[in-house]
Amino acid sequence: MNLFQAIILGIVQGLTEFLPISSSAHLRIVPALAGWDDPGAAFTAIVQIGTLAAVLIYFMKDIISIVGAVVSDLLKGKPLASDESRTGWMIAAGTIPIVVFGLAFKDDIETTLRSLYWVSAALIALALVLSIAEKHTSNRARQGRRGKAISEITWLDAMIIGFAQAMALIPGSSRSGVTITAGLFRNLDRETSARFSFLLSLPSVFAAGIYQLYKTWDVITASTDNMINIAVATVFAFIFGYLSIAFLLTYLKRHSTGIFIGYRLLLGISLIIMIGTGHLMP
């Protein structure tokens, strides 16, 4: 990987991590179309530290409030006394499924599931499920029922969204896509679904990034070029990730996810055609 490729992949990671179109799919597709080597699951996990930093900074006030409430309520012997501490514990509970599945299927995630067959299937499948979730949300709105706020999320909601997040281990699914979809089915409004999705991503993205950084440290530090490329990709992922968060939260206040559904279908079908005609190797 050269510096130009690192910059492009960092931008791709930042732009697509928080939109429901799958960053892992695009980090697999873009190199394939450009004739570059697959950067691999480890690169994806490490560069996600950049988008993790974007979430931390964008939601700094929320995170400080949640962490402060968890610590304060624990010291009082009432761990679930406030809405903020409940949210913190729900994020922790919702993280358990992706940790379990991530460890159980680690080898498949890094090899078999990176096939463009899986990527295209996941892009199309989630587009269809998200379209059903959107119809459910539209029906609720027509009935005059408002969506849940974060403080109204139940333990069942958190666990269902957490299990959905585990599906994002399949490239093409999209972490934000599956969690926003689950949130819509659980009657969260679109913006709240996205906001909870981003907060829920913090523990697992941090853990995966640190693990892959530790695991590949010798390779990364084997040359100055490797270190520079990873660092540059991570910085660009942070910048464009921050912009992506701001865009999506603003967009979902007034619009549905329809544009992303259409994009996923178009991309998934295009991939199948390109693979079938021999223009792209799976």
UniProtKB/Swiss-Prot annotation:
UniProt KW DNA-binding keyword: no
Catalytic activity: di-trans,octa-cis-undecaprenyl diphosphate + H2O = di-trans,octa-cis-undecaprenyl phosphate + phosphate + H(+)
Transmembrane segments: 40-60, 89-109, 113-133, 150-170, 196-216, 230-250, 258-278
GO molecular function, one term: undecaprenyl-diphosphatase activity
Topology of the protein relative to the lipid bilayer: Multi-pass membrane protein
Superkingdom classification of source: Bacteria
Known EC number: 3.6.1.27
Gene Ontology cellular-component annotations: plasma membrane
Entry keyword set: Antibiotic resistance, Cell inner membrane, Cell membrane, Cell shape, Cell wall biogenesis/degradation, Hydrolase, Membrane, Peptidoglycan synthesis, Transmembrane, Transmembrane helix
Cystines in this chain: none
Subcellular location: Cell inner membrane
Keyword Cell membrane: yes
Gene Ontology biological process terms in this record: cell wall organization; peptidoglycan biosynthetic process; regulation of cell shape; response to antibiotic
Biological role stated in the UniProt entry: Catalyzes the dephosphorylation of undecaprenyl diphosphate (UPP). Confers resistance to bacitracin.
Extra remark: Bacitracin is thought to be involved in the inhibition of peptidoglycan synthesis by sequestering undecaprenyl diphosphate, thereby reducing the pool of lipid carrier available.
Family listed: Belongs to the UppP family.
Protein name as it appears in the record: Undecaprenyl-diphosphatase
Species this chain originates from: Chlorobaculum parvum (strain DSM 263 / NCIMB 8327) (Chlorobium vibrioforme subsp. thiosulfatophilum)
Species classification: Bacteria, Pseudomonadati, Chlorobiota, Chlorobiia, Chlorobiales
Gene designation per UniProt: uppP
